[in-house]
Structures are given as structure tokens and as C-alpha cells.
UniProtKB/Swiss-Prot annotation:
Its cofactor is Mg(2+). GO terms for biological process: pantothenate biosynthetic process. NCBIfam families: panB, PRK00311.1. One of its GO terms (cellular component) is cytoplasm. Gene3D superfamilies: Phosphoenolpyruvate-binding domains. This is 3-methyl-2-oxobutanoate hydroxymethyltransferase. It catalyses: 3-methyl-2-oxobutanoate + (6R)-5,10-methylene-5,6,7,8-tetrahydrofolate + H2O = 2-dehydropantoate + (6S)-5,6,7,8-tetrahydrofolate. 3-methyl-2-oxobutanoate binds at residues 50-51, 89, 118. The gene is panB. It comes from the Bacteria.
């Protein structure tokens, strides 16, 4: 009799929403199958972020990321990670109107195994969110510091420092929740308003640079593992000196080759 392996339990939106006020959601970025496979058993959510334009392609911002780029990397991540809830960023310009957004979101669903798409913007995106969810697309919202607006904002600026900003952030969160977003990313928001939003809305919040009171946290993997060291935001905690460790290994390899120590007899065919 053949032995059948137990089916892999895929994390769903229902699983994540059930964690609110119960258990913190663990999220991280990934852009390829190798790291997605490594992260798979350890996280609830993997975001294929347009941040890859900076950390993977060494660009100054996320704006030149394309739909094709996001599809390519999402396919790779889905090939490596089988259990996490996988979110794909909708890149700049890919959801400028309902027709464009629907076309690109449906492409993500048809061409990859992504669980959801993420878009940036507040209450002005509520109608678009409703349109997408009516077509069966799970939408993750993103408010606060929005990297796709970096040129308009004149840089990466923390939000929620005054009463006007705090009021807008709360209005945005409530509007997006009503429109149907399943999760809400809070980026670069002062801790008190992030806490208020998390308490006021029923869907989980995932924070990045928004304090510890969010329902979950996300970091860019190359930041937290010490690979992307040209600039380190205040909110990043390095858990590994990855760049240094890899460079030391390559130096050792190069030294072994130069000295004739690699390959040795056990590493050679006869």
C-alpha cells in the first residue's frame, strides 16, 4: 500500500485574521525560491515587495519596478514557499485606474500562486478596493509612509506626528477596512496612532517602523540579516552580519583555490 504524505496546510486570510489580539503575525519579504524555502516554516506571511527594486536591483527607490518583474519574482517565491500567505506588491502605475488595476491583479492570480495583492493609498483607494474584492481578489492595504509616493513627499517621512496626520491615518484605515481590505500594513507611523488604528479596526495590522502594538511585524530580509548596509533605518534590527559572513566565506574559498587546497582528493573524481 502506498504511503501518502499529509497535505500541506496553506495559511489563509482567515488564519491571519483569527490571530488578531491573540498571536502576533510574523512576516518577511522574499524575492526568490531559495530564500522563500528557507523562510517557509518560520513565518506566516511572505511579501514579494517592490522593495526588491532597491535591495535586489540596487535602484534608489521602488518606482521603476514593473508588473513583469513582480510576476517573475512572485512565481519564484511561490515555487519555494508552500505554507505562508504570499502577498504581491502592485508596482507604481499598475493600479492607476480600475481597468488597469483589474487587469494586473487578475494577471497576478492567473500567473502565480499569490494569496493577495497589496496596494498603497488611503480612503481614495476605497472604491478600487471594492472593485477588486468584488472580483475575488484579496487586497492588502498600505498606509503611512508609502514608498511609491517618495518623490511626491520629498523623501521617506514618518507620518502621524501631528493631529491632522493622525486623523487622516485613522480615516484611511477605517475606510479601507470598510472597503474590504483583508490586512493593513502600517509603515513609518508614530506608535500612538498605530496603536489606535490597531485597536479601532477589526482586521490585523502589520507594522514596519510603526511600533510594537501592531498585530504583526514585517522587515525586509536583507536589512534584518545584515546584507543591505548602505542605509539602515532606525526601526531595523540586525539579527545577522550576513554580508560579513558571506564575504569571509568567499575569501576562504578564494584562498583555498589560490593555495591549491581546493579541490582536494575527496572532492575530485578518479
Amino acid at each position: 500500500m502506498s504511503m501518502q504524505t499529509a497535505p500541506i496546510k496553506k495559511t489563509t486570510l482567515n488564519h491571519l485574521q483569527a490571530k488578531k489580539n491573540q498571536e502576533k503575525i510574523i512576516a518577511i519579504t522574499a524575492y526568490d525560491a531559495l530564500f522563500a524555502q528557507i523562510f517557509d516554516p518560520l513565518v506566516d506571511v511572505i511579501l514579494v515587495g517592490d522593495s526588491l527594486n532597491m535591495s535586489f536591483f540596487n535602484q534608489n527607490d521602488t518606482l521603476s519596478a514593473s508588473v513583469e518583474m513582480m510576476l517573475y519574482h512572485t512565481k519564484a517565491v511561490c515555487a519555494g514557499a508552500k505554507t505562508p500567505f504570499i502577498i504581491t506588491d502592485m508596482p507604481f502605475g499598475s493600479y492607476k485606474d480600475e481597468k488597469t488595476a483589474l487587469k494586473n491583479a487578475i494577471r497576478v492570480y492567473k500567473e502565480t500562486q499569490a494569496s493577495a495583492i497589496k496596494l498603497e493609498g488611503g480612503k481614495e483607494k476605497a472604491k478600487l478596493v471594492k472593485t477588486l474584492t468584488n472580483e475575488g481578489v484579496i487586497v492588502v492595504g498600505h498606509i503611512g509612509l508609502m514608498p511609491q509616493f517618495v518623490r511626491l513627499d520629498g523623501g521617506y517621512k514618518i507620518k502621524g506626528k501631528n493631529e491632522e496626520q493622525q486623523k487622516k491615518l485613522l480615516e484611511d484605515a477605517l475606510s479601507l477596512e470598510e472597503a474590504g481590505v483583508g490586512l493593513l500594513v502600517l509603515e513609518g507611523i508614530t506608535t500612538p496612532i498605530a496603536q489606535t488604528i490597531t485597536q479601532k479596526i477589526k482586521i490585523p495590522t502589520i507594522g514596519i517602523g510603526s511600533g510594537k502594538d501592531c498585530d504583526g511585524q514585517i522587515l525586509v530580509w536583507s536589512d534584518m540579516l545584515g546584507f543591505f548596509d548602505s542605509f539602515k533605518p532606525k526601526f531595523v534590527r540586525e539579527y545577522l552580519k550576513g554580508k560579513e559572513l558571506v564575504q569571509n566565506a568567499i575569501k576562504q574559498y578564494a584562498d583555498d583555490v589560490k593555495k591549491g587546497n581546493f579541490p582536494n582528493e575527496l572532492e575530485s573524481y578518479h
